[in-house]
Design a protein with these regions (language model features):
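Polybasic, low-complexity association/targeting segments
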Residues: 1-18
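Transmembrane alpha-helix interface/packing and boundary motifs in multi-pass membrane proteins
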Residues: 48-57
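Conserved phosphate/anionic-ligand binding catalytic regions in large, soluble enzymes, centered on
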Residues: 56-65
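Acidic-glycine-rich active-site phosphate/pyrophosphate-binding loop
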Residues: 1-3, 30-48, 101-109
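DPxDG-like acidic metal-binding loop motif
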Residues: 65-73
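C-terminal binding/interaction regions
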Residues: 86-146
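Phosphate-handling active-site elements
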Residues: 33-44, 72-90
């Protein structure tokens, strides 16, 4: 792991401990620590993704946050900006790396504990830290950060 990825992992963990959900912790880390330009209005989109989309245990909120960061850096504002064929491979590749690293992208598979218990918070804290590290390495590798 690089110094940058370790820094991102620690910051994401601290954000989670301070009350951000998993998705918010990832996005807040990369917007504050890495300068990813996500404004407050866009940041609020993260709030519903915690607990695998509102505690549905579906798509991991940390994974959703990673897709938001990647899309902010590589995405488009208008269809004429660039074809989706340039963007989808980035998010698909990260999805595959996430699944390989953690065994699944589903919150229910990654987090077997009851929400808001000590075990849940400890498990998610560790996961958010590792996910932020994985994203940092990926962004560096793909040269997506300025």
């Amino acid at each position: 792991m690089s110094e940058f990825s370790e820094k991102m992992g620690m910051a994401a963990g601290n954000n989670f401990k301070s009350g951000y959900n998993c998705c918010e912790a990832i996005v807040e880390t990369f917007r504050k620590e890495a300068g990813v330009n996500i404004d407050d209005n866009a940041f609020r989109l993260c709030s519903g993704f915690g607990g695998g989309i509102g505690h549905a245990r579906d798509l991991c909120g940390a994974m959703a946050g990673c897709v938001m960061v990647i899309s902010t850096l590589a995405g488009r504002n208008q269809p004429s900006d660039k074809p989706l064929a340039e963007i989808y491979p980035l998010t698909l590749e990260f999805h595959e790396r996430f699944a390989k690293a953690f065994g699944s992208c589903a919150c229910g598979d990654l987090m077997p504990y009851e929400f808001n218990t000590r075990e849940h918070l400890k498990n998610c804290l560790k996961l958010v830290n590792k996910v932020a590290q994985l994203l940092a390495v990926y962004l560096e590798e793909k040269k997506l950060l300025k």
